[in-house]
Amino acid sequence: MSKSLVIVESPAKAKTINKYLGSNYVVKSSVGHIRDLPTVGSSNGEKAKAISTKGLSAEEKSAIKQEKDRNALVKRMGIDPYHQWKANYQILPGKEKVVAELKSLAKKADHIYLATDLDREGEAIAWHLREVIGGDDARFSRVVFNEITKNAIQQAFEKPEQLNLDRVNAQQTRRFLDRVVGFMVSPLLWKKVARGLSAGRVQSVAVKLVVEREREIKAFQPEEYWEIDVLTQTQAKQALRLAVTQFKGKKFEPKNATQAQSAVDFLQHADYVVSDLETKPTHSRAKAPFITSTLQQTASTRLGFGVKKTMMLAQRLYEAGYITYMRTDSTNLSQDALKMVRGYIQSHYGESYLPSKPVFYSSKENAQEAHEAIRPSDVNTLAEQLTGMDKDAVRLYDLIWRQFVACQMPAAQYDSTTVTVRAGEYELKAKGRILRFDGWTKVLPTMSKNAEDQVLPDVQLNEKLHLEHVLPEQLFTKPPARFSEAALVKELEKRGIGRPSTYAAIISTIQERGYVRVENRRFYAEKMGEIVTDRLNQSFTALMNYDFTANMENILDQIANGEKNWKTELNQFFKDFSQQLSQAELDELEGGMKPNSLVPTDINCPTCGRKMAIRTASTGVFLGCSGYALPPKERCKTTMNLIPEAELLNVLDEASETKALMERKRCPKCGTAMDSYLIDPERKIHICGHNPNCDGYVLEQGSFKIKGYDGPIVECDKCGADMHLKLGRFGKYMGCTSCDNTRKILKSGEVAPPKEEPTHFPELKCEKSDAYFVLRDGASGVFMSAHNFPKSRETRAPKVAELALYRDRLPEKLRYLADAPQHDPEGNDAIVRFSRKEKRQYVTSEKNGKATKWIVDYLGNQWVERKK
C-alpha cells in the first residue's frame, strides 16, 4: 500500500507532526524555501551577444545601451517588470539533494499534503514545492493548522484545502516590490552618495523613523523646571510626603531657582491643613493575549530579549507543539481555548478568579480573525514541564502562559486615596492605593511598583500637619525617548508599516545595513543613514511616505483576499516609481538627486597643504583632503580619522541624554546640538548635527583626553599602558592611550586576543597571485592568507603536513597542531579547522572539495579520532 507524503518546512516541525500521523504518512522537511529569485552575482543562461553599433547615430547607440542595461538589470533581479513580471525562480544553492529526495518520494506517494506554515510565506513555500515537484495538481492538498497538537493535526487532515493562489500572489507582490526598489535605487545611491549603500521599500521608511527621532533629540533644548516635595508628620507622628501641585489655583511649575526659592521661603513657615480626603475604588484590567508585536515588546521589557531572539524562540516552541502560531495580529481566542483556560482558572484559583463570561479583546483593523492570538497549546503544560527547550525558551513560554491565563481573569481592585493639603495659597497632594483584590496580577505580577502603591497614614479633615522638611529639586525636560527594538516595532505597527511576519526582518535589516546602530538597546541614527534618508525623501516622496507604505500593506491584504489583481498593482507601482527614478538620475541642477556634498574646513591637509573637508562615507564621518576631486595625477587621498568623544558611548537613558545634550555645543548657524570628535590630542572638532545640510562647525585647540572615562580597561600588549573603549568609523574597538596599538571588539562583546605576528612561509606560494602564504591566528582560529593582504585576499585552511615540515617556525602555543595526523585513513590531506561553538581547533580532511566525516580532536595532550 502506497503512503501519503507530508511536506513541512522545518525538521523540528516534521518530528512533532510525525508523532500524530499514522504509518500511512511519510513526513519530510523542505528545510525552508527550496527556490527563490537569483542571488546577487549568480548568472544563469547564455551571455548576451555583443551588438555592433558601427555607423549608428548617437540616439540609436543610446537606445541600444539602454536596452542592454535593462536586460542586465532584469537578469540580476530575476523578475521582468517590462514583460508581465515574468520571474526566474532558481533552486537555492545546497537544496538540490532536498529537492531530489522530495521528488523521489512524491513519485511513490499516492497523495501529497503541503503542511507549511499558515501565513503567506508558508503558502508561497507550498506553491514552490508544488511547482518544483510537478505532476497533476489534483495530487496536492494544502493543510493548515494554528497549533501542532494531535487534535489540530487530525482536524486539518480531515478537511484538506487547495492552495490559495491569492495569498501566494500577495507574497510574490511584496517580494517583487522589494526587489525592484532594492535593485533599482541602490545603484543610484552608489552613484550619487557613496558605494556600498542600499535602499529598501520598507527598510528605508523604518530608518526614516529613527532618523527623525535622532533629529528631534539633537534639536531639543532641555528646559529647567523645579518640583517641590514637603515632608510632614501627622498628629499621630506618622510621616506623610506631599507634592506641591498648585499655586493660586494654577498648576505649580517654577522655571528657575529664583521662583522655586520663593516658594520654599514661604513653605518653610506655612501652616499645613488637610483640606480634602477622597477615597474611590479603581481597577486595573489585564491586557489582551499576545499578538506578534506585543509579544516582542513584552519579551523585551520583561525578559530583555531582542526581537529576533524572541521570534527564534517562539518558532522553536511552536514547532515543538507548545504554543500556537507566533506570527499573528489577531487577539481572537478559539472557543476550545476559552473553555480550556476557564476550566484551569476555576480548578486552580477558584470561582472568585473566574469572570461570569469569557473576556473578549478587540483586534486592530485588518487583523486576520481566522488566526488566533499566541497562547499555550495546552494550558495544563507548565513551563517547568517543557522538554528539549533551553532556559530562555522556557522563560518565553512562561510569559506566554501567564499572559494567556491572566487575560481571562478579573481586574485587580484597589482603593485609591488622595489627600489634599492647603498651605496658604499653595495646594499639596499625596496619593496612595491599597490592593483589595489581586485578580489577574496573581498570575502575572506587575513589573514595577506604581508610584501610588503606598499606604497613606490616617488623617482627619482639617487636621494640622507638622512640617519636617521642604525638599526642592531641580529638573530638566527630557528629549523624546530613543527607540528600543520593541518600541520601534510598536511604532511600525501603529503606522501600519509591515506585518507580524516582517517586523523581525525589518529590525534586523536596518541594523545590518549600517544606517542605524544599537547602543545600550537603543537606536542611534548613523550620519549616512540621515543623508540617505534625506536623498530618498527628496527624490522618492511617495516611497518614503508613511501613509503610502501603510496603504501598500492594505493593498497586499486585498490581493491576499482576492479583492485586487496583483499584476495590476505591480504595474501601477512600477509606472510611478520609474518616473521618479528617471527624475532622480538627472543632474542636481535638472532636479535630480542631490549628491553627497562635503563641508569645507580651515584645517590644512598634512600632505599637500590644501584644505580638509568634512566627509561622510558608509563607514562614518572623517576629514578628507579637498584635493581628492582633482585629476588622478594631482589627486590627494589623505584622510584623517575622527574619534567620537567617549562619553557618547555611555548614554543609558533619557536623563543621561538630557545631561549630554546640555553639555554639547550648539551650532552657531542653526542651534542644533553638535557632534564632537577628537582629531588628535591637540585638536577637537564640533560638527553640526545637521551636517551636511548645515555646514556649521567649530574647531577647538587645546590638550584633549577622553574625559570621564569609566569604561573597560585592558593592558596594552605592546607598551603596557591602558587601552580604552573607542568608537571609530568601523565601530567599537580598544585603543591604547599611549601608543597606536588597537584591538577589535568581537560580536560577543569580548575584546579580541592580541594580534599575533604572522608566521611566514615563503616556500608556500599562493595560487591566484605572486604572493606567498603566512599563518595567521585570529578570532576564528588559524588560517593561511596571502602575505600582502589586503592586496591579495587569498586564504585557505592550513595543511597539517605543512605545519609539521616547518614546525620550528610555529609559535610554541601552536606546535601541537604539527603533531596531528597528516592524512586521513583514505590518504586525503589533513587540514586544521576551528570550532566556533567550542572555541578550539580540530583536524579534519576534504575529498573533492567536500568535508569528510573524519575528525580528530586534541584531548588530554593527544590527538584522538572522534567516533562517528
From Swiss-Prot:
Disulfide bonds: none annotated. PROSITE patterns: TOPO_IA_1, TOPO_IA_2, TOPRIM. Residues 198-203 are annotated as: Interaction with DNA. Residues 3-148 form the Toprim domain. Its EC number is 5.6.2.1. GO terms for biological process: DNA topological change. GO terms for cellular component: chromosome. A zinc finger (C4-type) spans 605-636, 667-694, 716-739. Its cofactor is Mg(2+). This is DNA topoisomerase 1. The lineage of its organism: Bacteria, Pseudomonadati, Pseudomonadota, Gammaproteobacteria, Pasteurellales. The gene is topA.
